[in-house]
Amino acid sequence: MKKVTAMLFSMAVGLNAVSMAAKAKASEEQETDVLLIGGGIMSATLGTYLRELEPEWSMTMVERLEGVAQESSNGWNNAGTGHSALMELNYTPQNADGSISIEKAVAINEAFQISRQFWAHQVERGVLRTPRSFINTVPHMSFVWGEDNVNFLRARYAALQQSSLFRGMRYSEDHAQIKEWAPLVMEGRDPQQKVAATRTEIGTDVNYGEITRQLIASLQKKSNFSLQLSSEVRALKRNDDNTWTVTVADLKNGTAQNIRAKFVFIGAGGAALKLLQESGIPEAKDYAGFPVGGQFLVSENPDVVNHHLAKVYGKASVGAPPMSVPHIDTRVLDGKRVVLFGPFATFSTKFLKNGSLWDLMSSTTTSNVMPMMHVGLDNFDLVKYLVSQVMLSEEDRFEALKEYYPQAKKEDWRLWQAGQRVQIIKRDAEKGGVLRLGTEVVSDQQGTIAALLGASPGASTAAPIMLDLLEKVFGDRVSSPQWQATLKAIVPSYGRKLNGDVAATERELQYTSEVLGLKYDKPQAADSTPKPQLKPKPVQKEVADIAL
């Protein structure tokens, strides 16, 4: 019966798309150089790059909702972290010999420096205005308890001192010092509990929705840019000349139109996978998606909000996925400070917060169903974790909060449903299918269509991700002197690494901090904390590395 239902649904969707395409033929076809599907931060960032690189190119952006930045980019639908691995412990895994690997942390930090430079450049151009409206200095802290976790954090701190990107980080195991950094976390805590924390002053809280709105508002000032809201893509068809005909439905009046584009970018968040599949390119067959939602506890009580100015990340329990890392964060949303705690995982078959319950079923195909099954079998701990999260009661969530805020009061907090994230499942020759952390740019061989899949670190690395896309689909142009000069004007460190170059790191941090109105003091010598001799890590089954 389930198979029949799925088949009938697929037929209905297919017939509807054919009907839409037929109706669209009767209307005049719109032509554009670049079609941006989705009104989120990825499309906005790519459009902003292309506006500087090729100002004469025409661009059309289509968004199914009534406004831009209303899904994952919306400030209330994500954690608002400027992910730079200053506090996220899952980016520094412990190796089997007990040492700490910092390669992933360095890569994440390098990527965020590109985002800072991109935003600073847009402020200087007048594209982004009033930096305080979208980015603010909020110290980033890691906080752990228990002897093993304290040893891990001490070793992590020592390992990160090898990189110029993490200079200025401080470490402490002293209750009084940590209380000064994060009073809300320490007040009411057992004074005998073994704790440790790191703190980096240059952490940030970012409103990605505000960045998106400002970037798109600037694009709209040009006559060769068109924004179409309440417009949903129903079909994509490759033409003989390698252009694309995209059928777009107007959700308000029920009409449809065809847009003929030389290049199509699918930056539709959770909906990107289904649209990529609709395109029919062979590269899409390697991917499936699994949706995971998130909830946060929110407090707007001034007694709580004014007592906490930091993003404080903990450590996932043994065997739990990194998505379970709790954090209690200062946020600045719509000009107002609030405190969020979470996330708590939720499950829905929707790929978007405003999506359809049929999303998961309609994206499941004969080519990706086996990789999905392999991932489910290989990640039973993850399945158990998700089930346990869905079963959490109000009291369970409050008890989790009290581990980070011992004196919390229930009446100060409310539960908020944040956005959906579609985790990448990719076909793997060895394992059948693997769950992937991060984002991936998937494109056809001709470089005429590209999609962004994945969830983390997401918006905080929009600028470097879109740079990767430019290099992948516009390789010849990227290597030209004109594009090289423009890209280096947008991102001064483009083409080189900051890690290992103290002077270059300090120069870029000083520049972006001044333009974006962020705090930055030149780092002093690192604390002389001894590096512990960690015990070799017991051999454990690899945990799926995914994140909300």
Swiss-Prot record:
Its EC number is 1.1.5.4. GO terms for molecular function: 2-hydroxyglutarate dehydrogenase activity; L-malate dehydrogenase (quinone) activity. The keyword Ribosomal protein does not apply. InterPro entries: FAD/NAD-bd_sf, MQO. Residues 539-548 have a biased composition (Basic and acidic residues). Its cofactor is FAD. It catalyses: (S)-malate + a quinone = a quinol + oxaloacetate. It comes from the Bacteria. Residues 521-548 are annotated as: Disordered. One of its GO terms (biological process) is tricarboxylic acid cycle. Keywords: FAD, Flavoprotein, Oxidoreductase, Tricarboxylic acid cycle. Pathway: Carbohydrate metabolism; tricarboxylic acid cycle; oxaloacetate from (S)-malate (quinone route): step 1/1. PANTHER family: L-2-HYDROXYGLUTARATE DEHYDROGENASE, MITOCHONDRIAL. Belongs to the MQO family. This is Probable malate:quinone oxidoreductase. It comes from Escherichia coli (strain ATCC 8739 / DSM 1576 / NBRC 3972 / NCIMB 8545 / WDCM 00012 / Crooks).
